[in-house]
Amino acid sequence: MKTSVLFAILGLALLFCLSFGVELEETGRECGGLMTRCDGKTTFCCSGMNCSPTWKWCVYAPGRR
């Protein structure tokens, strides 16, 4: 009984890690959020964000959509 509960918990943890990795891989190809590295040529920021020319990361830009 204890062993089966342990295997169930480990299985759920493994499933969570795999799904998180797949989701992270999918979002890696999209736009960058706050404090995400950008260069304005190949990597871009999401709406509401602007690529800072000084720091080369996405910063909040009020008024930009």
From Swiss-Prot:
Residues 22-29 form a propeptide. GO terms for cellular component: extracellular region. InterPro entries: Huwentoxin-1, Huwentoxin_CS1. The modification Proline amide is found at residue 62. The presence of a 'disulfide through disulfide knot' structurally defines this protein as a knottin. Probable ion channel inhibitor. Shows insecticidal activity when injected into mealworms. This is Orally active insecticidal peptide-3. It comes from Selenotypus plumipes (Australian featherleg tarantula). The lineage of its organism: Eukaryota, Metazoa, Ecdysozoa, Arthropoda, Chelicerata.
